[in-house]
């Protein structure tokens, strides 16, 4: 049994009896139904993973023989889902957007005959009339995605027609595709098989979720808070009333011993509504915190840290806002936000913490100093600042010392940064070379003078004044060394010092006393 004597059939077609019989019947009838193709594949037990290749070869043969491949419109989505689930081990769900994923698409489509648009006709799922087969064509993924919107409009006109169809990624999928341009509205829908090169891979497509995060946390935060719309005065009052009612309900629930079940449920609902209103008011004013935090950048705290501290002040403002005063919430919340930020800077911004009240004095002094600099055209003196601030000049100098910012010894200097600030600071513990030389000479002269004395006299003086080990000894300790009384040691010391005071010995040592 041969479908054509002029060509050699592919082995996947020639070895399939049902497919060969289907080709012969198509040559006789001039057309083949899509359901018949699927049944032929199932009858020959062709694996679903090979359906695409077999269908591609079959389509080539049908084109040469002039046979039209028809797709029935009566196939319901539920039946297609059941059939695919039964035969395909790897199931992939495709909707009307599946065309956007197709890289190379070949469609064998048939134009359906005009039908009456009604819900009953669509529900009865009448098969579309056969029409002349169109030429096979290839489209890229962009072209398929561009057709998606037009196909959606056309499908909406057909009442009862469902858009979503369950397609198998490894078999030739049936998909309703719209024609191009204005021909869609006049002639109806085109239906056909969609062959995609994406089906070459039997593995399920990997879905990658892109969260939209960037490397800039500030940008991400601003993008997130910008999604909440701003509130007008009426909306702020409405939210404040709900918050007030929620707080009252929470107080009643906490303090009441026994409540009726119905009343308790109502209070819980009101309390929950108050919490939602509080969150709404907070989220709608997060941008106010950002605008205020920008004024305090570059003062020792990161921008995001300033925002976080300002958010704490915003929460406090929401809890204490009194809508009956008639002011907008932003007017009231600004002061709480600024207070929270400035307090956080006073506690955290400095390496050496300064009390909050002293920070306020330092800031006040800095403001007055800047103002007087503009007025006088020069730096004001401590006396002028003291007169302006009503404090003593000594107090002004002391406050200015407190306000100095510490600087790291490792701060790089110069354009190349090859040296550090610590390299320029004198080491107070380092020995001055001149002093070291002078001390060495003094020791030599002192030993030369002691050499003019007797051994006992030199030893007593050396131990008495610690000339050898730097530890002076008492008369008793020296007496025990020489085995004499402390009085005898005192006499030896007195006699020796008289000898050392003689100009012949003391003159060489007097120069080192200056």
Swiss-Prot record:
Upregulating conditions: Transcription is regulated by the alternative sigma factor ShbA.
Region listing for Sigma-70 factor domain-4, in residue ranges: 449-502
GO BP: DNA-templated transcription initiation
Key words, A-Z: Cytoplasm, DNA-binding, Sigma factor, Transcription, Transcription regulation
Any one Gene Ontology cellular component term annotated for this protein: cytoplasm
Region (Sigma-70 factor domain-3): 360-436
Membrane spanning stretches: none
Highest taxon, organism lineage: Bacteria
Motif (Interaction with polymerase core subunit RpoC): 305-308
InterPro entries reported for this sequence: RNA_pol_sigma-70_dom, RNA_pol_sigma70, RNA_pol_sigma70_r1_2, RNA_pol_sigma70_r2, RNA_pol_sigma70_r3, RNA_pol_sigma70_r4, RNA_pol_sigma_r2, RNA_pol_sigma_r3/r4-like
Disulfide pattern: none
UniProt keyword DNA-binding, yes or no: yes
UniProt-annotated location(s): Cytoplasm
Gene Ontology MF terms: DNA binding; sigma factor activity
Gene3D superfamilies noted in UniProt: RNA Polymerase Primary Sigma Factor, Winged helix-like DNA-binding domain superfamily/Winged helix DNA-binding domain
DNA-binding region positions on the chain: 475-494
Record text on subunit structure and interactions: Interacts transiently with the RNA polymerase catalytic core.
PANTHER family: RNA POLYMERASE PRINCIPAL SIGMA FACTOR HRDA, RNA POLYMERASE SIGMA FACTOR RPO
Family the UniProt entry places it in: Belongs to the sigma-70 factor family. RpoD/SigA subfamily.
Record's protein name: RNA polymerase principal sigma factor HrdB
